[in-house]
Amino acid sequence: MTIVNIESAPAVESAGSSNPRDYTDIHIRWSLKDGEPHVDCVGSLVFPVVKPGERPRPQRPAKVIYQLLDELAGSCFAVATATKDFLIHHAETNVFFRGRFDDRAVDGTWYRLRVISAKPPRLENLGFPMPTIYVEQLMDPAFARGGLIAVMGQAGSGKTNTASAIVVSRLHRYGGMAFGIEDPPELPLNGWHGEGYCTQASVAGEDGKDWVESMRGALRSQPVGTDLMMYLGELRDASSAQMALRAATNGFLVICTTFASDIISGLEAMLNLAGREHADTLAHTLRVAVYQTLLPAEGRLLVDTLTSDGPTSRVGVILRSGDLRRLEDEIRYQKHQVAAEFARMQAARARAA
């Protein structure tokens, strides 16, 4: 099928690039001609990469990118009929895109594509550095016995990057096996990472049963005696939240992301999703709750954490009570402890220098 007749598209003579890595996002608009789908090259949008602190702005595509739009549209068309969210790979440039099929816009049907890294992130080389003290919290070897790490934040705060980096970094340091269950996979984690291996599954977000079945499959196929992780893009419903807690009590280190305005609201959301009767299980499984805020203009990642040593710890007792507002004092206390430890580390470095 002919996706687009490039020669018939009016030329846009503005400067541009055919390298997809020169863009953060590419939005491809479809139009119908004689009942057949075609790409409207002129009506599409590209968002060029900008300098740190600047915000990408939409531009009309230059003619040099029309062939790329055609190729990407063909890849989208092949997968977007089964799911609205998808991952595609442009083989010629080895660039991955996270895509969304948008058929609700008043000006036509769109493929909204985000360029993603071809190299999985690690905690030590995130785009916006995470302080070492928090990295070491997340790399605690004791977590290999199982539990829950929840990465929280608002939209665009880098939750997926951090959660993925936890998986990759722990596989590199400790080996083992990780199961990724996402809608769709947002970063290319599948494959070997040092002595550890990650396998990714793409599930359809419209049906919660797909999530539960994928999680159940991971539980059934766990290798005996191996360090195990389960990475969930996001908890979607009660069944998946309950299954995540079950996995965390069954030897998996479960890593998930959730939208939140702070740590307490994030834990409240998880508990409400799973059911308040699962407060005791959350108290048994929670290892670290991470809340992060991205400040792109300053090149900074602000991080707060809440760690728990189990159901009899101060955090565990509060979680079991169900009154999560009482965590405020513990969060402040732990933040003070982290600040004091950071000051000691800085002083030690100064003496060593």
Model-derived features: positions:
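Short, flexible helix-loop junctions that flank or precede catalytic/ligand sites
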Residues: 3-353
